[in-house]
Amino acid sequence: GIENVVVTSQDPHAFLKDFEGYFDCVILDAPCSGSGMTRKKEKMEDDWSWEKVEKLVPIQKDLIELAYKLVKKNGLISYSTCSYAKQEDEQIVCYLMENHEVELLNIPDDGSLKGIEGIGRRYIPGLYKGEGQYQCILKKLGDSIENDFQPIEYKRTIKGFDNFYAVKY
């Protein structure tokens, strides 16, 4: 497995103090209205609303800004949602592109559809295995703080996980 990956659902604002400009890549699966989950939810029409979209857009903008601050120069941001609403997808990416130096990277055609105005990819059930998704990959070009982070050469065992991967017969 990959040893230098952390998966968290903690408030990302907590990372800024110690890790601004630190990460090679931030994968942001943003909270969204879930409009791409139509096959999974029996009563999607009861769960989805424009009000929900409008409530989530400021959160998504805040999170993509944080992702931008956390990646180092030339680092990557993968932004995804399980929504089809352009307000939660392409418009969030455009917001970042209008406010920061980023490069929109091409995602190869893998059966998905190009996003609106060619921004990112849309994964549609029936055309792609899985639920509905949106994804975009951006490369940070500018506005990066200089840091003196050095790689740490040690193995740390988290209490309770020391035998997590041990094979037992």
Model region roles, listed by residue range:
Residues G1-Y169:
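S-adenosylmethionine
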